[in-house]
Amino acid sequence: MSLSSKLTVQDLELKDKRVFIRVDFNVPLDGKKITSNQRIVAALPTIKYVLEHNPRYVVLASHLGRPNGERNEKYSLAPVAEELQSLLGKPVTFLNDCVGSEVDSAVKASAPGSVILLENLRYHIEEEGSRKVDGQKVKASAEDVAKFRKELCSLADVYINDAFGTAHRAHSSMVGFDLPQRAAGFLLTKELQYFGKALENPTRPFLAILGGAKVADKIQLIDNLLDKVDSIIIGGGMAFTFKKVLENAEIGDSIFDKAGAEIVPKLMEKAKAKGVEVVLPVDFVIADAFSADANTKIVSDKEGIPAGWQGLDNGPESRKLFAATIAKAKTIVWNGPPGVFEFEKFASGTKAMLDEVVKSSTSGNTVIIGGGDTATVAKKYGVTDKISHVSTGGGASLELLEGKELPGVAFLSEKN
């Protein structure tokens, strides 16, 4: 699946067309109040571009939260409609459902150039294809799923996907539109361009920075990246499993991943065969408890971590080592912070690493931050706009980096 050959919104003839855009309006809510409108703002360029090209109307659809295939007012998109209306500066019609005869009539009767937001797609079991009942998975029937998809599809001539955060899910709104033109919006196109360049044609040296607790969770990621990168920094909790297996280091009460430990030698063999440099921390900030106000000290890997203590961040020597590795790279993909940045005492390693990748990005290199915790870090320290690309999809970006095909991307039309 080439990421750079997909049809984009700019390839479409939009005049007088009925346009359906799958957006990601899965915003955080406090009751009915939106606490961050970032995802709505991110969709505006695509919506505005379509409106400038005089469509018959624009239908927007999204999920919000996990209503488990049934109506739940807690997850209504009504507050999003209000916020979108004020951001767009034009009326947004909010409909009480996403399929059914009332939706069909309202959409068809809308004035030319209207913007219509449908209610939460996940109110229907047919969107995800299943729901949980008493802890058991209950599947939607194939007939019901086909009917749901057909009803959504009947609202449109053209389908645009701008929801990268859900691109790794084969949900109805991601893969159910039997239309000749299925294009990526600006947000999705940007994701595909950055990941496509890094994974298909990177400017070298190419560095991957990986954090996270368990090696076992990251095996596929490390294995796939070893085929592509020139060097890897391994930080976070999983560094302790590598240190223990490779150097028999004393790791005290730090995270040790038994299942992952069995795979470490194989991964290192592959790294050696591919000529990939693997960089591990050489000192640690350790704590006598996993808590924000724990007692702390710095130890080198030679000293080891004593029993009763655990490593929660890398130390000053590791920061220097990582900085030197980052300084050599021309393309950097970062997925997972190197320490427990949520606690101030253990945030220095993450902050130092962030400073180095910002330096790299502002000097013209390509730096991609995978979504999830690492994107949270960039946001926390206010540097999102100083990084080449901060991904909007944690799970989706991880699966891309693991070498998996994303159903929502594979489903898009190819450029002619």
UniProtKB/Swiss-Prot annotation:
Task: Provide the primary localization.
Answer: cytoplasm
Q: Which reaction does it catalyse?
A: (2R)-3-phosphoglycerate + ATP = (2R)-3-phospho-glyceroyl phosphate + ADP
Q: What's the family?
A: Belongs to the phosphoglycerate kinase family.
Subcellular location(s): the record lists: Cytoplasm; Mitochondrion
InterPro entries in the cross-refs = Phosphoglycerate_kinase, Phosphoglycerate_kinase_CS, Phosphoglycerate_kinase_N, Phosphoglycerate_kinase_sf
According to the UniProt entry, what is the EC number of this protein? 2.7.2.3
Pathway this chain belongs to: Carbohydrate degradation; glycolysis; pyruvate from D-glyceraldehyde 3-phosphate: step 2/5
What GO terms describe the biological role, i.e. biological process, of this protein? Answer: gluconeogenesis; glycolytic process
Residues annotated as binding AMP are 213-214, 218, 237, 311, 342
Q: What does this protein do?
A: Catalyzes one of the two ATP producing reactions in the glycolytic pathway via the reversible conversion of 1,3-diphosphoglycerate to 3-phosphoglycerate. Both L- and D- forms of purine and pyrimidine nucleotides can be used as substrates, but the activity is much lower on pyrimidines. Negatively regulates the biosynthesis of acetyl-CoA from pyruvate in the mitochondrion.
* Residues that hold CDP according to the record: 212, 217, 236, 336, 341
Protein name per UniProt = Phosphoglycerate kinase
- Which SUPFAM superfamilies does the protein's record reference? Phosphoglycerate kinase (SSF53748)
Residues recorded as binding (2R)-3-phosphoglycerate, renumbered to this chain, are: 23-26, 38-39, 62-63, 65-66, 121-122, 168-169
What would you give as a GO molecular function for this chain, any one? phosphoglycerate kinase activity
State the oligomer form and interacting partners: Monomer.
Chain sites annotated for binding ATP: 213, 218, 237, 311, 342, 373-374
Q: Which UniProt keywords apply?
A: ATP-binding, Cytoplasm, Glycolysis, Kinase, Magnesium, Metal-binding, Mitochondrion, Nucleotide-binding, Transferase
**So where does Mg(2+) get bound?**
213, 216-217, 373
Please give the GO cellular component terms listed in this UniProt entry.
cell surface; cytosol; extracellular region; fungal biofilm matrix; mitochondrion
List cofactor names only: Mg(2+)
> Which amino acid positions bind ADP, per UniProt?
212, 236, 341
